[in-house]
């Protein structure tokens, strides 16, 4: 079979000329048995790397037991998964979805219902420039990218975009219909921009004063990637709503939005929202395995231990190559800005030739999202392969 045959697939992706067949640890292998060091982890999904023995065993055991029922019945896995996620997030109530964009949609509905119950119809949102929250119509409305939005307008009305890390720009946009402020705790596609602590605290204060909900999008930066379970913890604040996906299932299609009790008591009720597949026994077995393995293998400790070395390795490249301009990020979510004279797509292609997988973000940035099981020798290997690629320019 020709794996590159695309005649029956809607052409929404520009794929690299690589056919991936299997993975092991932090490595992927193509159909020609070429071994790649993966520093993209399926766009931040595969936190435990590939072919993790315990994770696979838990999933296989559940496959033999029960794949799916529906949310008309109880299942033990969803209860445990919700407890794990509520504890990790320091929030109270969980709704499981199938993806990140669905989690955003659910968060938006929750915020609208909360505002509606206060007498505010058509609640409005404040999001941020350079944001990315998803591609379904609601999430797309919060995504500040005209290229993505233009063919699908009109989108949800009343969305305003503030300047990230600038509280005064947010304050100017708040009105009596504002129901929520949403931000990525670390902007991903927009260029790996972390929210600074003072900004996050000021947002929390503003939301408390105005009874506006604060939504933290942790889909890419959450689940340990920042060195804490969720990146908002670095600012020592709690959002009212948090969205999760990607590494929550480490390859299984699962997302969630999590809310505090105040919001839970004043928003969604039976019949307000639903999902056929959301929280089924299989994906929740995977979620529970992820939390169990994170604890057993001290995944957060590993990220915190190795982050300084990863940052140092990238900083050395900035010192060595004039066109490497700036490093940004938090934990195992890092970006390296390149001068416009060197196209990031060409650097990524050279890296692939050197058996290193990276992806882009921002205007012209390399994005580093390695599996959280990364070891020091893998950082050294990445530096060697990337340095070799950069010497071509």
Curated annotation (Swiss-Prot):
This protein's UniProt keywords: Amino-acid biosynthesis, Aminotransferase, Arginine biosynthesis, Cytoplasm, Pyridoxal phosphate, Transferase
Domain of life: Bacteria
Gene3D superfamilies: Aspartate Aminotransferase, domain 1, Type I PLP-dependent aspartate aminotransferase-like (Major domain)
Record-linked Pfam families: Aminotran_3 (PF00202)
Gene Ontology terms, MF aspect: identical protein binding; N2-acetyl-L-ornithine:2-oxoglutarate 5-aminotransferase activity; pyridoxal phosphate binding
Catalyzed chemical reaction(s): N(2)-acetyl-L-ornithine + 2-oxoglutarate = N-acetyl-L-glutamate 5-semialdehyde + L-glutamate
Pathway: Amino-acid biosynthesis; L-arginine biosynthesis; N(2)-acetyl-L-ornithine from L-glutamate: step 4/4
Keyword Amino-acid biosynthesis: yes
Residues modified to N6-(pyridoxal phosphate)lysine: 246
Example of a GO biological process term: L-arginine biosynthetic process
Disulfide bond positions: none
Binding site for pyridoxal 5'-phosphate: 100-101, 132, 217-220, 276
Cofactor dependency: pyridoxal 5'-phosphate
Main location as per UniProt: cytoplasm
Cofactor note: Binds 1 pyridoxal phosphate per subunit.
Transmembrane spans: none
EC number(s) per entry: 2.6.1.11
Other noteworthy facts: May also have succinyldiaminopimelate aminotransferase activity, thus carrying out the corresponding step in lysine biosynthesis.
Quaternary structure annotation from Swiss-Prot or TrEMBL: Homodimer.
Family, per entry: Belongs to the class-III pyridoxal-phosphate-dependent aminotransferase family. ArgD subfamily.
Protein name: Acetylornithine aminotransferase
UniProt source species: Campylobacter jejuni subsp. jejuni serotype O:2 (strain ATCC 700819 / NCTC 11168)
Upper classification of the organism: Bacteria, Pseudomonadati, Campylobacterota, Epsilonproteobacteria, Campylobacterales
């Amino acid at each position: 079979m020709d794996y590159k045959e695309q005649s029956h697939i809607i052409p929404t992706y520009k794929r690299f000329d690589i056919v991936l067949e299997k993975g092991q640890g932090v490595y992927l292998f193509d159909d020609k048995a070429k071994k790649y060091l993966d520093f993209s982890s399926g766009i931040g999904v595969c936190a435990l790397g590939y072919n993790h023995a315990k994770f696979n065993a838990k999933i296989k055991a559940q496959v033999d037991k029960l794949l799916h029922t529906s949310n008309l019945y109880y299942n033990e896995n969803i209860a445990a998964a919700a407890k794990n996620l509520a504890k990790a997030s320091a929030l109270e109530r969980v709704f499981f979805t199938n993806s990140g964009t669905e989690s955003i949609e659910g968060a938006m509905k929750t915020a609208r219902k909360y505002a509606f119950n206060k007498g505010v119809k058509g609640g409005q949102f404040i999001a941020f420039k350079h944001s990315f929250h998803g591609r379904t119509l609601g999430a797309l409305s919060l995504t500040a990218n005209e290229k993505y939005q233009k063919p699908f307008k009109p989108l949800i009305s009343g969305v305003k975009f503030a300047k990230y890390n600038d509280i005064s720009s947010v304050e100017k946009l708040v009105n009596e219909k504002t129901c929520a402020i949403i931000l990525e705790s670390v902007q991903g596609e927009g260029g790996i921009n972390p929210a600074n602590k003072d900004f996050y605290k000021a947002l929390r204060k503003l939301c408390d004063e105005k009874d506006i909900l604060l939504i933290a999008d942790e889909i890419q930066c959450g689940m340990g990637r920042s060195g804490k379970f969720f990146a908002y913890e670095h600012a020592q604040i709690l959002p009212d709503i948090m969205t999760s996906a990607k590494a929550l299932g480490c390859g299984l299609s699962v997302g969630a939005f999590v809310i505090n009790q105040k919001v839970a008591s004043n928003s969604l009720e039976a019949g307000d929202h639903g999902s056929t597949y959301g929280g089924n026994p299989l994906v929740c077995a995977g979620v529970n395995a992820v939390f169990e393995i994170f604890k057993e293998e001290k995944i957060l400790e590993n990220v915190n231990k190795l982050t300084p070395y990863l940052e140092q390795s990238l900083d050395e490249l900035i010192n060595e190559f004039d066109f490497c301009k700036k490093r940004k990020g938090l934990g195992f979510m890092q970006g390296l800005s390149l001068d416009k004279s060197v196209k990031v797509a060409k650097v990524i292609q050279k890296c692939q030739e050197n058996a290193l997988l990276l992806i882009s973000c921002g205007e012209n940035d390399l994005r580093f999202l390695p599996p959280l099981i990364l070891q020091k020798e893998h950082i050294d290997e990445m530096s060697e392969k990337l340095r070799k690629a950069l010497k071509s320019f």
